[in-house]
Protein backbone atom coordinates (compact mmCIF):
# COMPACT_ATOMS: atom_id res chain seq x y z
CA UNK A 1 0.00 0.00 0.00
CA UNK A 2 1.35 3.41 -0.95
CA UNK A 3 1.81 6.16 1.62
CA UNK A 4 1.80 8.74 -1.16
CA UNK A 5 0.26 11.98 0.03
CA UNK A 6 -1.49 14.29 -2.39
CA UNK A 7 -1.50 18.05 -2.25
CA UNK A 8 -4.72 19.45 -0.82
CA UNK A 9 -6.22 22.15 -2.98
CA UNK A 10 -8.79 24.58 -1.57
CA UNK A 11 -12.43 23.55 -1.41
CA UNK A 12 -13.30 26.21 -3.95
CA UNK A 13 -11.50 28.98 -5.82
CA UNK A 14 -11.52 31.97 -3.45
CA UNK A 15 -12.17 35.50 -4.60
CA UNK A 16 -9.81 38.34 -3.74
CA UNK A 17 -9.90 42.01 -4.66
CA UNK A 18 -6.72 43.87 -5.58
CA UNK A 19 -6.32 47.61 -6.17
CA UNK A 20 -3.36 47.74 -8.57
CA UNK A 21 -2.92 51.49 -8.09
CA UNK A 22 -2.72 51.29 -4.30
CA UNK A 23 -0.45 49.35 -1.97
CA UNK A 24 -2.46 46.23 -2.82
CA UNK A 25 -0.69 46.26 -6.18
CA UNK A 26 2.61 45.33 -4.54
CA UNK A 27 3.64 41.82 -5.61
CA UNK A 28 4.22 40.65 -2.04
CA UNK A 29 0.80 41.92 -0.93
CA UNK A 30 -0.83 40.02 -3.81
CA UNK A 31 1.03 36.82 -2.89
CA UNK A 32 0.16 37.26 0.79
CA UNK A 33 -3.55 37.88 0.16
CA UNK A 34 -3.70 34.94 -2.23
CA UNK A 35 -2.00 32.55 0.20
CA UNK A 36 -4.26 33.66 3.05
CA UNK A 37 -7.38 33.14 0.92
CA UNK A 38 -6.21 29.73 -0.30
CA UNK A 39 -5.37 28.64 3.25
CA UNK A 40 -8.74 29.81 4.55
CA UNK A 41 -10.38 27.67 1.85
CA UNK A 42 -8.49 24.56 2.96
CA UNK A 43 -5.28 24.50 0.89
CA UNK A 44 -2.31 22.83 2.57
CA UNK A 45 1.27 24.15 2.84
CA UNK A 46 2.45 22.15 -0.17
CA UNK A 47 -0.25 23.75 -2.35
CA UNK A 48 0.65 27.22 -1.06
CA UNK A 49 4.34 26.60 -1.80
CA UNK A 50 3.44 25.50 -5.34
CA UNK A 51 1.51 28.74 -5.87
CA UNK A 52 4.35 30.88 -4.45
CA UNK A 53 6.98 29.15 -6.59
CA UNK A 54 4.93 29.62 -9.76
CA UNK A 55 3.95 33.21 -8.94
CA UNK A 56 7.54 34.25 -8.23
CA UNK A 57 9.00 32.54 -11.31
CA UNK A 58 8.61 35.51 -13.63
CA UNK A 59 7.69 39.15 -13.93
CA UNK A 60 4.68 41.08 -12.60
CA UNK A 61 2.48 40.03 -15.53
CA UNK A 62 3.32 36.39 -14.76
CA UNK A 63 2.36 36.97 -11.12
CA UNK A 64 -1.08 38.23 -12.13
CA UNK A 65 -1.56 35.42 -14.66
CA UNK A 66 -0.61 32.68 -12.18
CA UNK A 67 -2.61 34.27 -9.36
CA UNK A 68 -5.73 34.37 -11.53
CA UNK A 69 -5.36 30.61 -12.06
CA UNK A 70 -5.55 30.04 -8.29
CA UNK A 71 -8.13 32.64 -7.23
CA UNK A 72 -10.85 34.77 -8.79
CA UNK A 73 -8.91 38.01 -9.07
CA UNK A 74 -10.94 41.23 -9.10
CA UNK A 75 -8.70 44.07 -10.23
CA UNK A 76 -9.62 47.67 -9.54
Question: Which functions belong to the PLM regions below?
Answer:
Residues 2-76:
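Long, contiguous binding/interaction regions
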Amino acid sequence: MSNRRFMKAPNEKPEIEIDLDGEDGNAFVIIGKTCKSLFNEGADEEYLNKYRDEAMSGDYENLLKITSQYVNLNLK
